[in-house]
Amino acid sequence: PYKAVCTHGWVVDGEGKTMHKSLGNGIEPKEIYDKNGADILRLWVASSDYHSDIRISKPILAQLSEAYKKIRNTARYILGNLSNQGGFDLDKDGVAYESMEELDKWAIMRLDNLIDKVNEAYNAFDFHIVFHAIHNFCVVDMSNFYLDIIKDRLYCEKPDSAIRRSTQTAMYRILSAISRLVAPILSFTADEIWSYMNHCASENPESVFLNCLLYTSD
């Protein structure tokens, strides 16, 4: 028994041709997760628009592996800056939204937009929109803009300065949200990120899956 079901088109090769053993154009799932890991296989499924035929090839998987690295590297950078110089405890060091720096408020605003878009996409079973939204957020909003601008705060300000704590508060909320939002797709990666976080009292540190997955900022 199930409440909903998705159907999809044929899985075809990179050129759109039907896979046949005689053509040698098939790819075994085991070959993918042995080489790239299970999360890359899950990401391929999620990134595909299942309303039409779904293409798979080694170049497509290579592109997805690079996209995956962007998301993972964003999480790793944030984790590093929440754990260095004595670490960051949201319950003790967190800054209230109204007292945060304007740039950090902007980051939270962009995060809220992402949460709304991803929640809407999950509810509509548009998993490819989930992937593209999270990837664009990590690359465009975070890596190319926000995380680049805040480097001086993180590396030059005193560890417990108000401006640095403001940034760390935003980073914590971003990391917590991203972990939850990607968990249905990048399950192993999300749980690994979660295991390294110094969690606030309202979160269950045991597993990301023991928390509300479709996270809201309220």
Q: Where would I find each of the regions flagged by the language model?
A:
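Core structural elements
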Residues: A67-R76, K105-N113, H132-D152
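Short helix-adjacent coil turns
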Residues: Y122-I129
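Beta-strand segments within the central parallel beta-sheet cores of soluble alpha/beta enzyme folds
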Residues: K3-T7, S207-L210
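Short alpha-helical scaffolding segments that buttress acidic/His motifs in well-ordered protein cores
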Residues: V5-C6, I40-S47, A75-I78, I134-C138, ...
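Catalytic adenosine-cofactor/nucleotide-binding cores of aminoacyl-tRNA synthetases and other
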Residues: W10-Y97, H199-N204, V208
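Acidic, turn-prone loop/beta-hairpin segments
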Residues: Q85-D116, D148-S217
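Hydrophobic, well-ordered secondary-structure elements that form the walls
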Residues: V5, G16, I71, M142, ...
